[in-house]
């Protein structure tokens, strides 16, 4: 959702934004844009429209996109029986390109089968796209290598930091106040299995048992996700609920550090957001994070909570308060990595170029 909010907000601020651009945004994205103060009147056709997976087939979306030269689904797959327009689809389904991951290996035989079928079916839908748009080069390489799409039909447009982080006057307060009493570690994201959030209570206990260090963990789960966690998790972790984009900087500001133990991503903005807020980042030692954060994160094996606890304790006891130069350098690294405005321009340019090429052909 963060990407959709950022892209639409940036498009609304472009003087060159096309008059014939139709925006279909979900309720959640629309609410986020309103809180940001985005001028949605800049679009000649802006509609609130919700689609959910396969139900898209009978949602009426087909009639809404009919007559447009290009349809760009920010993150697919796009479930339509037929797409008469040029079909550009954003790809961020890591399970398709990295199927044999740690979470998959923990599944029962039946769940492995259903998982394979689900993502095989999604891959077939992605194959129908005229062009796929990905956020990093490793995703393009994997898609081409697995035959989901020819490399010539895959465009890389780097994801990055939402511009709201650069304008404190746009930040909003949290609905739930955070009362800090000890070193606080935050996580921003959904509670998907591959996010590996089950580590948090284990790390908290290990820090106390092995290092006599008390810490607090804070997460941003929705009500359903929180209700599905164990009593042990709820007794060990604080939940502030889902945040709007404009509230995320405030959340990071109140944390002493950020943790990101994910097993699997195409790309995630959370590591960049932590670094631009000049917070130490404890993250999975995985290529999808190293490619983005370089040497500015503190890395640990996401399968090893002891290693994570030792890393955090080392930081608190030896580095905290002495890493201002590193944190400032990390912020500059993020600012130079990519640009939210340029991402929106690149998306718009891609649509216009493909439409022009098709009309000439």
Outline where the language-model segments fall.
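Aromatic "clamp/platform" in nucleotide-sugar-dependent glycosyltransferases that forms part
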Residues: 263
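Membrane-proximal helix-turn-helix segments that form the acceptor-binding/catalytic region
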Residues: 111-132
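Short hydrophobic beta-strand element within catalytic cores of glycosyltransferases
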Residues: 280-283
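Donor nucleotide-sugar binding/catalytic pocket of nucleotide-sugar-dependent glycosyltransferases
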Residues: 127-145, 149-168
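Nucleotide-activated donor-binding/catalytic signature segment of Leloir-type glycosyltransferases, i.e.
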Residues: 39-44, 227-249
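Conserved donor-binding/catalytic core segment of Leloir-type glycosyltransferases
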Residues: 175-195, 201-204
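Conserved acidic donor-binding segment of nucleotide-sugar-dependent glycosyltransferases
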Residues: 298-306, 314-320
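A charged, aromatic-enriched C-terminal amphipathic alpha-helix characteristic of glycosyltransferases
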Residues: 320, 324-358
């Amino acid at each position: 959702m963060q990407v959709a909010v950022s892209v639409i907000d940036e498009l609304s601020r472009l003087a060159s934004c096309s008059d014939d651009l139709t925006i279909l945004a979900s309720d959640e994205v629309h609410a986020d844009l309103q809180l940001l103060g985005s001028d949605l009147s800049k679009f000649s056709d802006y509609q609130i429209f919700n689609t959910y997976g396969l139900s898209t087939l009978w949602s009426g979306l087909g009639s809404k996109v009919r007559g447009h030269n290009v349809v760009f689904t920010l993150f697919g797959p796009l479930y339509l029986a037929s797409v008469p327009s040029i079909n550009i689809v954003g790809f961020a389904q890591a399970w398709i390109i990295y199927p044999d991951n740690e979470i998959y290996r923990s599944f029962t035989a039946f769940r492995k089968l259903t998982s394979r079928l689900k993502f095989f079916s999604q891959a077939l839908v992605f194959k129908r796209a005229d062009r796929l748009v990905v956020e990093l080069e490793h995703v393009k390489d994997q898609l081409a290598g697995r035959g989901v799409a020819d490399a010539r039909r895959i465009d890389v447009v780097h994801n990055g930091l939402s511009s709201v982080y650069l304008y404190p006057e746009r930040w909003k307060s949290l609905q739930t106040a955070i009362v800090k009493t000890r070193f606080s570690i935050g996580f921003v994201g959904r509670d998907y299995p591959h996010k590996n959030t089950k580590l948090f209570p284990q790390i908290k206990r290990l820090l106390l048992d092995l290092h006599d260090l008390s810490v607090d963990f804070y997460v941003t789960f929705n009500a359903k996700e929180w209700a599905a966690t164990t009593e042990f998790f709820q007794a060990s972790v604080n939940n502030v609920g889902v945040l709007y984009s404009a509230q995320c900087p405030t959340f990071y500001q109140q944390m002493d550090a950020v943790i990101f133990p994910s097993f699997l991503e195409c790309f995630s903005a959370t590591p960049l957001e932590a670094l631009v807020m000049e917070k130490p980042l404890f993250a999975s030692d995985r290529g999808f994070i190293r490619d983005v954060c370089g040497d500015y994160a503190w890395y640990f094996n996401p399968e090893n909570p002891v290693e994570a606890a030792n890393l955090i304790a080392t930081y608190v006891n030896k580095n905290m308060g002495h890493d201002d130069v590193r944190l400032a350098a990390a912020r500059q690294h993020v600012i130079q990595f990519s640009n939210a405005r340029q991402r929106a321009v690149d998306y718009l340019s891609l649509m216009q170029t493909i439409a022009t090429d098709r009309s000439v052909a």
